[in-house]
Amino acid sequence: MDALQNLLDRNAQWAARVSSENPEFFRQLAAQQAPDYLWIGCSDSRVPANQIVDLAPGELFVHRNVANVVSHSDVNCQSVIQFAVDVLKVEHIMVVGHYGCSGVRSALTCESVNGVADYWLGHVRDVA
């Protein structure tokens, strides 16, 4: 529980800092999201989408998965795309890769990760 409490404490500190820097931040953020971009990227923890393109929360609609795969059979990804286009009216859709992707590496080297992840990475192998 200490690890979870640490995250909760850090969130509270972040919220306090943001509120002190911009007292209207959370009110404005809660009002609505109106991003121009849909980012489809890798779930790699080293690639924080908003941060690496210097956009604030609400400015980038994000979908992430292992190896930034877009598959016709992935209902989750297809739902994100439809919602982004039809509801949020995003103007740009980006599929973003990165250097050192362990998902792509595992797929291309046929390194088995066992379980459902092997099935998922099959989409990468299919187009390699």
Over which residues does each language-model region extend?
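Divalent-metal-activated hydrolytic enzyme cores
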Residues: 1-35, 67-91, 101-128
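Short beta-strand segments
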Residues: 40-42, 64, 94-98
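N-terminal short beta-loop-beta anion/metal-coordinating cradle
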Residues: 18-59
